[in-house]
Protein backbone atom coordinates (compact mmCIF):
# COMPACT_ATOMS: atom_id res chain seq x y z
CA UNK A 1 0.00 0.00 0.00
CA UNK A 2 2.12 2.86 -1.34
CA UNK A 3 0.03 5.65 0.21
CA UNK A 4 -0.29 4.03 3.63
CA UNK A 5 -0.19 6.58 6.45
CA UNK A 6 0.21 6.51 10.20
CA UNK A 7 -2.36 7.98 12.56
CA UNK A 8 -0.15 11.03 13.09
CA UNK A 9 0.38 11.58 9.38
CA UNK A 10 -3.36 11.49 8.72
CA UNK A 11 -4.15 14.10 11.38
CA UNK A 12 -1.18 16.25 10.32
CA UNK A 13 -2.08 16.21 6.62
CA UNK A 14 -5.70 17.11 7.38
CA UNK A 15 -4.59 20.27 9.20
CA UNK A 16 -2.06 21.81 6.82
CA UNK A 17 -3.15 25.32 5.90
CA UNK A 18 -0.08 26.26 3.89
CA UNK A 19 3.33 24.78 3.04
CA UNK A 20 5.57 27.61 1.82
CA UNK A 21 8.70 26.33 0.12
CA UNK A 22 11.67 26.40 2.47
CA UNK A 23 9.53 27.23 5.50
CA UNK A 24 7.76 25.30 8.24
CA UNK A 25 4.17 24.37 7.32
CA UNK A 26 1.27 26.26 8.86
CA UNK A 27 -1.26 23.99 10.59
CA UNK A 28 -4.77 24.71 11.84
CA UNK A 29 -5.56 24.43 15.55
CA UNK A 30 -8.98 23.03 16.50
CA UNK A 31 -8.85 23.55 20.26
CA UNK A 32 -6.76 25.92 22.36
CA UNK A 33 -6.63 25.38 26.12
CA UNK A 34 -5.27 28.13 28.36
CA UNK A 35 -4.57 28.57 32.06
CA UNK A 36 -3.46 31.35 34.37
CA UNK A 37 0.32 30.88 34.19
CA UNK A 38 1.30 30.92 30.51
CA UNK A 39 -1.45 33.15 29.10
CA UNK A 40 -1.12 36.67 30.63
CA UNK A 41 1.67 37.88 28.33
CA UNK A 42 -0.10 36.40 25.32
CA UNK A 43 -3.29 38.35 25.99
CA UNK A 44 -1.23 41.47 26.73
CA UNK A 45 0.41 41.12 23.33
CA UNK A 46 -3.00 41.03 21.66
CA UNK A 47 -4.09 44.16 23.51
CA UNK A 48 -0.94 46.06 22.54
CA UNK A 49 -1.39 45.08 18.89
CA UNK A 50 -5.12 45.81 18.94
CA UNK A 51 -5.98 42.28 17.82
CA UNK A 52 -9.03 40.17 18.57
CA UNK A 53 -9.22 36.39 18.89
CA UNK A 54 -9.58 34.59 15.58
CA UNK A 55 -11.95 31.99 17.04
CA UNK A 56 -12.85 32.65 20.69
CA UNK A 57 -15.31 29.74 20.66
CA UNK A 58 -12.38 27.35 20.16
CA UNK A 59 -10.46 28.61 23.19
CA UNK A 60 -11.19 27.23 26.67
CA UNK A 61 -9.67 28.50 29.90
CA UNK A 62 -9.37 27.26 33.45
CA UNK A 63 -7.45 28.00 36.63
CA UNK A 64 -5.35 25.13 37.94
CA UNK A 65 -1.60 25.64 38.45
CA UNK A 66 -1.64 28.27 41.19
CA UNK A 67 -5.01 27.60 42.79
CA UNK A 68 -5.44 26.50 46.38
CA UNK A 69 -6.63 22.98 47.11
CA UNK A 70 -7.70 24.00 50.61
CA UNK A 71 -10.09 26.85 49.79
CA UNK A 72 -11.87 28.25 46.74
CA UNK A 73 -11.44 31.76 48.11
CA UNK A 74 -9.15 34.25 46.40
CA UNK A 75 -7.91 35.15 49.87
CA UNK A 76 -6.27 31.71 50.06
CA UNK A 77 -3.93 32.57 47.19
CA UNK A 78 -0.50 34.16 47.31
CA UNK A 79 -0.32 37.70 45.89
CA UNK A 80 1.21 36.43 42.63
CA UNK A 81 -1.30 33.60 42.27
CA UNK A 82 -4.19 35.96 42.92
CA UNK A 83 -2.89 38.37 40.31
CA UNK A 84 -2.63 35.56 37.77
CA UNK A 85 -6.14 34.19 38.29
CA UNK A 86 -7.69 37.66 38.36
CA UNK A 87 -5.80 38.58 35.19
CA UNK A 88 -7.05 35.44 33.44
CA UNK A 89 -10.62 36.22 34.48
CA UNK A 90 -10.35 39.75 33.09
CA UNK A 91 -8.70 38.58 29.86
CA UNK A 92 -11.39 35.98 29.28
CA UNK A 93 -14.06 38.63 29.85
CA UNK A 94 -12.34 41.10 27.50
CA UNK A 95 -11.83 38.58 24.70
CA UNK A 96 -14.98 36.46 25.04
CA UNK A 97 -13.26 33.25 26.14
CA UNK A 98 -15.16 30.56 28.04
CA UNK A 99 -13.66 30.31 31.54
CA UNK A 100 -13.96 27.61 34.18
CA UNK A 101 -12.88 29.63 37.21
CA UNK A 102 -12.25 28.44 40.76
CA UNK A 103 -15.96 28.65 41.57
CA UNK A 104 -17.17 26.71 38.52
CA UNK A 105 -18.31 23.12 39.21
CA UNK A 106 -16.28 21.89 36.22
CA UNK A 107 -13.05 23.71 37.14
CA UNK A 108 -9.99 21.52 37.27
CA UNK A 109 -6.65 20.60 35.79
CA UNK A 110 -6.81 21.57 32.14
CA UNK A 111 -5.82 18.09 30.94
CA UNK A 112 -8.49 16.44 33.09
CA UNK A 113 -11.28 18.93 32.49
CA UNK A 114 -10.87 19.11 28.69
CA UNK A 115 -11.47 15.43 27.96
CA UNK A 116 -14.32 14.99 30.43
CA UNK A 117 -16.20 17.91 28.85
CA UNK A 118 -15.77 16.49 25.36
CA UNK A 119 -13.55 19.39 24.29
CA UNK A 120 -10.95 16.79 23.30
CA UNK A 121 -12.01 14.92 20.16
CA UNK A 122 -10.32 12.40 17.83
CA UNK A 123 -8.56 13.77 14.78
CA UNK A 124 -8.21 17.29 16.14
CA UNK A 125 -5.13 19.42 16.78
CA UNK A 126 -5.02 20.65 20.37
CA UNK A 127 -2.47 22.99 21.92
CA UNK A 128 -1.93 24.49 25.36
CA UNK A 129 0.83 26.43 27.06
CA UNK A 130 1.70 23.38 29.11
CA UNK A 131 4.14 20.54 28.45
CA UNK A 132 1.70 17.75 29.31
CA UNK A 133 -0.80 18.65 26.60
CA UNK A 134 0.17 15.29 25.08
CA UNK A 135 -2.45 13.82 27.43
CA UNK A 136 -5.18 14.53 24.87
CA UNK A 137 -3.46 12.30 22.33
CA UNK A 138 -5.18 9.39 24.07
CA UNK A 139 -8.21 10.25 21.93
CA UNK A 140 -6.36 10.15 18.63
CA UNK A 141 -5.79 13.90 18.70
CA UNK A 142 -2.48 15.56 17.87
CA UNK A 143 -1.85 17.46 21.09
CA UNK A 144 1.29 19.24 22.22
CA UNK A 145 2.52 22.03 24.45
CA UNK A 146 3.48 25.48 23.17
CA UNK A 147 5.27 28.54 24.51
CA UNK A 148 3.67 31.84 25.48
CA UNK A 149 4.58 33.55 22.19
CA UNK A 150 2.88 30.68 20.37
CA UNK A 151 -0.14 31.01 22.66
CA UNK A 152 -0.49 34.58 21.41
CA UNK A 153 -0.11 33.46 17.79
CA UNK A 154 -2.84 30.81 18.14
CA UNK A 155 -5.17 33.26 19.86
CA UNK A 156 -4.69 35.69 16.97
CA UNK A 157 -4.69 33.30 14.00
CA UNK A 158 -5.87 29.84 15.13
CA UNK A 159 -2.77 28.48 13.38
CA UNK A 160 0.84 27.56 14.13
CA UNK A 161 4.03 27.05 12.17
CA UNK A 162 5.29 23.56 12.89
CA UNK A 163 7.89 21.22 11.47
CA UNK A 164 6.63 17.71 10.82
CA UNK A 165 7.92 15.17 13.33
CA UNK A 166 9.25 11.69 12.75
CA UNK A 167 7.03 8.74 13.67
CA UNK A 168 7.60 6.10 16.33
CA UNK A 169 5.47 3.08 17.18
CA UNK A 170 5.62 1.75 20.72
CA UNK A 171 3.83 -1.58 20.86
CA UNK A 172 3.05 -3.18 24.20
CA UNK A 173 2.16 -6.75 23.39
CA UNK A 174 0.01 -9.08 25.47
CA UNK A 175 -1.64 -8.25 28.76
CA UNK A 176 -0.40 -6.96 32.09
CA UNK A 177 -0.60 -8.98 35.28
CA UNK A 178 -2.53 -8.01 38.42
CA UNK A 179 -1.30 -4.87 40.13
CA UNK A 180 0.20 -3.37 36.98
CA UNK A 181 -1.39 -0.15 35.74
CA UNK A 182 -1.08 2.34 32.90
CA UNK A 183 1.42 4.30 35.02
CA UNK A 184 3.62 1.23 35.29
CA UNK A 185 3.42 0.66 31.54
CA UNK A 186 4.57 4.16 30.66
CA UNK A 187 7.29 4.21 33.32
CA UNK A 188 8.57 0.90 31.98
CA UNK A 189 8.63 2.38 28.47
CA UNK A 190 10.60 5.42 29.62
CA UNK A 191 12.94 3.16 31.55
CA UNK A 192 13.58 1.20 28.36
CA UNK A 193 14.14 4.04 25.86
CA UNK A 194 15.29 6.79 28.21
CA UNK A 195 14.31 10.42 28.63
CA UNK A 196 15.50 11.31 25.13
CA UNK A 197 14.43 8.15 23.33
CA UNK A 198 11.43 9.87 21.77
CA UNK A 199 13.10 13.17 20.88
CA UNK A 200 11.96 14.37 17.47
CA UNK A 201 9.11 11.87 17.26
CA UNK A 202 5.37 11.72 17.63
CA UNK A 203 4.74 8.38 19.32
CA UNK A 204 1.81 6.09 18.63
CA UNK A 205 1.13 3.69 21.49
CA UNK A 206 -0.48 0.43 20.42
CA UNK A 207 -0.68 -3.28 21.16
CA UNK A 208 -3.07 -5.39 23.21
CA UNK A 209 -2.03 -3.85 26.53
CA UNK A 210 -2.77 -0.33 25.29
CA UNK A 211 -6.05 -1.34 23.65
CA UNK A 212 -7.16 -2.91 26.94
CA UNK A 213 -6.72 0.36 28.83
CA UNK A 214 -9.62 2.62 29.73
CA UNK A 215 -9.52 6.20 28.46
CA UNK A 216 -8.17 7.23 31.85
CA UNK A 217 -5.33 4.76 31.44
CA UNK A 218 -4.57 5.88 27.91
CA UNK A 219 -4.44 9.49 29.10
CA UNK A 220 -1.88 8.49 31.73
CA UNK A 221 0.32 6.89 29.06
CA UNK A 222 0.08 9.80 26.61
CA UNK A 223 0.56 12.32 29.42
CA UNK A 224 4.09 11.05 29.96
CA UNK A 225 5.08 10.90 26.28
CA UNK A 226 6.86 14.20 26.86
CA UNK A 227 8.96 12.51 29.56
CA UNK A 228 10.56 10.32 26.91
CA UNK A 229 11.31 13.42 24.84
CA UNK A 230 8.46 12.97 22.35
CA UNK A 231 6.60 15.87 20.74
CA UNK A 232 3.31 14.09 21.37
CA UNK A 233 1.79 10.71 22.11
CA UNK A 234 -1.27 9.23 20.40
CA UNK A 235 -3.59 6.24 20.64
CA UNK A 236 -5.93 5.37 17.78
CA UNK A 237 -9.60 5.99 18.63
CA UNK A 238 -11.81 2.93 19.03
CA UNK A 239 -15.06 1.90 20.69
CA UNK A 240 -13.59 2.65 24.12
CA UNK A 241 -13.01 6.22 22.92
CA UNK A 242 -16.48 6.60 21.44
CA UNK A 243 -18.20 5.24 24.54
CA UNK A 244 -16.27 7.70 26.72
CA UNK A 245 -17.18 10.71 24.57
CA UNK A 246 -20.85 9.92 23.97
CA UNK A 247 -23.12 12.52 25.57
CA UNK A 248 -20.35 14.81 26.82
CA UNK A 249 -21.05 18.54 26.63
CA UNK A 250 -18.91 19.49 23.64
CA UNK A 251 -19.02 16.16 21.81
CA UNK A 252 -21.14 15.96 18.63
CA UNK A 253 -24.82 15.20 19.14
CA UNK A 254 -27.60 13.37 17.27
CA UNK A 255 -26.91 12.97 13.53
CA UNK A 256 -23.59 14.77 13.94
CA UNK A 257 -22.51 12.02 16.32
CA UNK A 258 -22.98 9.24 13.78
CA UNK A 259 -21.11 11.24 11.16
CA UNK A 260 -18.28 11.98 13.58
CA UNK A 261 -17.87 8.34 14.64
CA UNK A 262 -17.75 7.25 11.01
CA UNK A 263 -14.89 9.70 10.43
CA UNK A 264 -13.10 8.79 13.66
CA UNK A 265 -13.09 5.10 12.73
CA UNK A 266 -10.95 5.97 9.71
CA UNK A 267 -8.36 7.77 11.83
CA UNK A 268 -6.01 4.88 12.39
CA UNK A 269 -2.69 3.74 11.01
CA UNK A 270 -3.05 1.99 7.67
CA UNK A 271 -1.77 -1.52 7.13
CA UNK A 272 1.64 -1.21 5.57
CA UNK A 273 2.39 2.23 6.99
CA UNK A 274 6.06 2.60 7.87
CA UNK A 275 7.29 4.16 11.11
CA UNK A 276 10.70 5.78 11.47
CA UNK A 277 11.29 3.82 14.67
CA UNK A 278 9.64 0.88 16.43
CA UNK A 279 9.87 -0.14 20.09
CA UNK A 280 8.34 -3.33 21.47
CA UNK A 281 7.61 -4.44 25.02
CA UNK A 282 5.99 -7.54 26.47
CA UNK A 283 3.30 -6.49 28.94
CA UNK A 284 3.76 -9.67 30.98
CA UNK A 285 7.30 -8.56 31.82
CA UNK A 286 6.15 -5.29 33.40
CA UNK A 287 5.94 -5.14 37.19
CA UNK A 288 4.78 -2.20 39.33
CA UNK A 289 7.35 0.55 38.74
CA UNK A 290 9.09 2.99 41.06
CA UNK A 291 11.60 5.72 40.21
CA UNK A 292 14.82 5.80 42.24
CA UNK A 293 16.50 8.92 40.81
CA UNK A 294 15.84 12.40 39.53
CA UNK A 295 14.24 11.76 36.15
CA UNK A 296 11.43 9.41 35.06
CA UNK A 297 13.88 7.21 33.16
CA UNK A 298 15.66 6.27 36.38
CA UNK A 299 13.13 3.61 37.27
CA UNK A 300 13.07 -0.04 38.34
CA UNK A 301 10.49 -2.65 39.31
CA UNK A 302 9.27 -2.63 42.90
CA UNK A 303 10.93 -6.00 43.53
CA UNK A 304 14.27 -4.64 42.34
CA UNK A 305 17.11 -2.68 43.91
CA UNK A 306 18.62 0.76 43.51
CA UNK A 307 21.10 0.27 40.64
CA UNK A 308 24.84 0.66 41.10
CA UNK A 309 26.49 3.36 38.95
CA UNK A 310 29.69 1.28 38.93
CA UNK A 311 27.89 -1.23 36.71
CA UNK A 312 27.23 1.46 34.09
CA UNK A 313 29.78 1.49 31.26
CA UNK A 314 28.85 4.90 29.86
CA UNK A 315 30.77 7.59 31.83
CA UNK A 316 28.11 10.25 31.29
CA UNK A 317 25.29 7.97 32.42
CA UNK A 318 27.36 6.81 35.39
CA UNK A 319 27.96 10.40 36.48
CA UNK A 320 24.25 11.18 36.12
CA UNK A 321 23.37 8.19 38.28
CA UNK A 322 25.87 9.19 40.95
CA UNK A 323 24.52 12.72 41.06
CA UNK A 324 20.94 11.44 41.28
CA UNK A 325 21.74 9.09 44.15
CA UNK A 326 23.51 11.85 46.05
CA UNK A 327 20.47 14.13 45.72
CA UNK A 328 17.85 11.49 46.38
CA UNK A 329 19.74 10.16 49.42
CA UNK A 330 19.83 6.47 48.50
CA UNK A 331 22.59 3.89 48.29
CA UNK A 332 23.15 1.44 45.45
CA UNK A 333 21.81 -2.02 46.25
CA UNK A 334 18.98 -0.82 48.51
CA UNK A 335 15.80 -2.87 48.10
CA UNK A 336 13.05 -0.62 46.77
CA UNK A 337 10.68 -1.99 49.41
CA UNK A 338 13.06 -0.79 52.14
CA UNK A 339 12.66 2.87 51.16
CA UNK A 340 10.58 4.79 53.71
CA UNK A 341 8.50 7.85 52.84
CA UNK A 342 6.93 10.65 54.87
CA UNK A 343 4.72 12.29 52.22
CA UNK A 344 2.25 10.96 49.65
CA UNK A 345 0.63 12.86 46.81
CA UNK A 346 -2.19 11.31 44.80
CA UNK A 347 -3.20 13.68 42.02
CA UNK A 348 -1.86 15.61 38.97
CA UNK A 349 -2.83 15.53 35.29
CA UNK A 350 -1.25 12.06 35.17
CA UNK A 351 -3.28 10.30 37.84
CA UNK A 352 -6.19 12.28 39.34
CA UNK A 353 -9.14 10.83 37.45
CA UNK A 354 -11.92 8.73 38.95
CA UNK A 355 -10.28 5.43 37.98
CA UNK A 356 -7.09 6.53 39.72
CA UNK A 357 -8.91 7.43 42.92
CA UNK A 358 -10.82 4.15 42.91
CA UNK A 359 -7.54 2.27 42.55
CA UNK A 360 -5.99 4.15 45.46
CA UNK A 361 -9.08 3.73 47.64
CA UNK A 362 -8.78 -0.06 47.43
CA UNK A 363 -5.52 0.18 49.38
CA UNK A 364 -6.77 2.84 51.79
CA UNK A 365 -10.05 1.16 52.75
CA UNK A 366 -10.05 -0.14 56.30
CA UNK A 367 -6.46 0.95 56.87
CA UNK A 368 -4.72 3.95 58.42
CA UNK A 369 -2.01 6.22 57.10
CA UNK A 370 1.22 5.26 58.84
CA UNK A 371 2.51 7.34 61.73
CA UNK A 372 4.67 10.21 60.55
CA UNK A 373 3.23 10.18 57.03
CA UNK A 374 1.17 13.01 55.53
CA UNK A 375 -0.92 11.96 52.54
CA UNK A 376 -3.12 14.12 50.34
CA UNK A 377 -5.59 13.20 47.62
CA UNK A 378 -6.35 15.89 45.05
CA UNK A 379 -9.07 15.10 42.48
CA UNK A 380 -8.32 16.42 39.01
CA UNK A 381 -11.56 18.33 38.52
CA UNK A 382 -14.88 19.29 40.02
CA UNK A 383 -16.51 16.44 38.13
CA UNK A 384 -14.02 13.90 39.46
CA UNK A 385 -14.46 15.21 43.00
CA UNK A 386 -18.26 15.02 42.78
CA UNK A 387 -18.16 11.49 41.35
CA UNK A 388 -15.70 10.31 43.99
CA UNK A 389 -17.86 11.74 46.75
CA UNK A 390 -20.97 10.14 45.25
CA UNK A 391 -19.15 6.81 45.46
CA UNK A 392 -17.98 7.46 49.01
CA UNK A 393 -14.30 7.47 48.10
CA UNK A 394 -13.72 10.68 50.03
CA UNK A 395 -14.94 9.00 53.21
CA UNK A 396 -12.61 6.05 52.64
CA UNK A 397 -9.64 8.37 52.31
CA UNK A 398 -10.60 10.62 55.21
CA UNK A 399 -11.27 7.69 57.57
CA UNK A 400 -7.85 6.29 56.66
CA UNK A 401 -6.18 9.60 57.50
CA UNK A 402 -5.66 11.05 54.03
CA UNK A 403 -6.46 14.71 53.38
CA UNK A 404 -9.24 15.21 50.80
CA UNK A 405 -8.66 18.38 48.80
CA UNK A 406 -10.17 20.63 46.11
CA UNK A 407 -9.16 20.20 42.44
CA UNK A 408 -5.91 21.65 41.13
CA UNK A 409 -2.36 20.87 40.02
CA UNK A 410 -1.34 20.89 43.67
CA UNK A 411 1.90 19.18 44.69
CA UNK A 412 2.92 18.18 41.17
CA UNK A 413 5.02 21.34 41.05
CA UNK A 414 6.18 23.82 43.68
CA UNK A 415 4.08 26.66 42.27
CA UNK A 416 1.36 26.80 44.90
CA UNK A 417 1.03 26.20 48.64
CA UNK A 418 1.13 22.40 48.29
CA UNK A 419 4.84 21.67 48.35
CA UNK A 420 7.38 19.51 50.08
CA UNK A 421 10.01 20.66 52.55
CA UNK A 422 13.70 19.98 52.09
CA UNK A 423 14.46 16.36 52.93
CA UNK A 424 10.89 15.13 52.50
CA UNK A 425 10.56 11.86 50.59
CA UNK A 426 7.33 11.57 48.64
CA UNK A 427 5.48 8.79 46.86
CA UNK A 428 3.89 10.79 44.06
CA UNK A 429 1.52 9.93 41.22
CA UNK A 430 2.71 12.92 39.20
CA UNK A 431 4.94 12.88 36.11
CA UNK A 432 8.26 14.48 37.06
CA UNK A 433 10.78 13.70 39.79
CA UNK A 434 13.35 16.36 38.92
CA UNK A 435 15.45 17.99 41.63
CA UNK A 436 13.25 20.47 43.51
CA UNK A 437 10.18 19.73 41.40
CA UNK A 438 7.90 19.43 44.45
CA UNK A 439 9.86 21.87 46.59
CA UNK A 440 13.45 22.88 47.21
CA UNK A 441 15.44 19.88 48.45
CA UNK A 442 12.45 17.53 48.07
CA UNK A 443 12.84 13.92 46.94
CA UNK A 444 10.20 12.45 44.65
CA UNK A 445 9.44 8.85 43.69
CA UNK A 446 6.95 8.37 40.84
CA UNK A 447 4.43 5.56 41.27
CA UNK A 448 0.88 4.55 40.40
CA UNK A 449 -2.06 5.62 42.61
CA UNK A 450 -2.32 2.10 44.05
CA UNK A 451 1.38 2.06 44.91
CA UNK A 452 1.16 5.52 46.46
CA UNK A 453 -1.80 4.62 48.67
CA UNK A 454 -0.12 1.40 49.76
CA UNK A 455 3.05 3.30 50.66
CA UNK A 456 0.97 5.75 52.70
CA UNK A 457 -0.43 3.04 54.95
CA UNK A 458 2.79 1.01 55.14
CA UNK A 459 5.13 3.96 55.61
CA UNK A 460 7.41 2.57 52.92
CA UNK A 461 7.13 1.25 49.39
CA UNK A 462 5.51 -2.17 49.06
CA UNK A 463 4.85 -4.66 46.30
CA UNK A 464 1.08 -4.41 45.98
CA UNK A 465 0.99 -7.82 44.33
CA UNK A 466 1.78 -9.37 47.71
CA UNK A 467 0.16 -9.11 51.16
CA UNK A 468 1.51 -6.24 53.24
UniProtKB/Swiss-Prot annotation:
Q: What is its EC number?
A: 4.2.1.33
Which ranges of the sequence are coiled-coil?
none
- Cofactor binding, note field: Binds 1 [4Fe-4S] cluster per subunit.
**Protein keywords:** 4Fe-4S, Amino-acid biosynthesis, Branched-chain amino acid biosynthesis, Iron, Iron-sulfur, Leucine biosynthesis, Lyase, Metal-binding
- What molecular functions are annotated in GO for this chain? 3-isopropylmalate dehydratase activity; 4 iron, 4 sulfur cluster binding; metal ion binding
Annotated positions binding [4Fe-4S] cluster = 349, 409, 412
Cofactor(s), names only, from the UniProt record? [4Fe-4S] cluster
A GO BP entry is: L-leucine biosynthetic process
- State the superkingdom: Bacteria
Q: Which reaction does it catalyse?
A: (2R,3S)-3-isopropylmalate = (2S)-2-isopropylmalate
Pathway(s) this gene product operates in, as recorded in its UniProt entry: Amino-acid biosynthesis; L-leucine biosynthesis; L-leucine from 3-methyl-2-oxobutanoate: step 2/4
Signal peptide extent? none
Oligomeric state and interaction partners are given as: Heterodimer of LeuC and LeuD.
Which family is this protein grouped under?
Answer: Belongs to the aconitase/IPM isomerase family. LeuC type 1 subfamily.
The record describes the protein's role as: Catalyzes the isomerization between 2-isopropylmalate and 3-isopropylmalate, via the formation of 2-isopropylmaleate.
PANTHER family under this entry? 3-ISOPROPYLMALATE DEHYDRATASE (PTHR43822:SF9), HOMOACONITASE, MITOCHONDRIAL-RELATED (PTHR43822)
HAMAP family from the entry?
Answer: LeuC_type1
This chain belongs to the protein called 3-isopropylmalate dehydratase large subunit
Amino acid sequence: MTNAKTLYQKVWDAHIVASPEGEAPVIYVDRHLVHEVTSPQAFSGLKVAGRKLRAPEKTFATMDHNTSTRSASLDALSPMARTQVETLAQNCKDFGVRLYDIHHPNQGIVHVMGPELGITLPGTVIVCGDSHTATHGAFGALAFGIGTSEVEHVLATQTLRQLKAKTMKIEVRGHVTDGVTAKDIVLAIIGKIGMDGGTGYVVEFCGEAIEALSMEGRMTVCNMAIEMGAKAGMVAPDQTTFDYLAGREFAPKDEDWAEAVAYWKAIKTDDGAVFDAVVELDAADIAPQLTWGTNPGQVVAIDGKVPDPLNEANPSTRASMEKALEYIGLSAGTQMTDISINKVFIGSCTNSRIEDLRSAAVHAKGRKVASGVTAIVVPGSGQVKAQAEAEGLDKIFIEAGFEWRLPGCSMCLAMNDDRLEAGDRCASTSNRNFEGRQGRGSRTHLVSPAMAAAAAVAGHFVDIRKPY
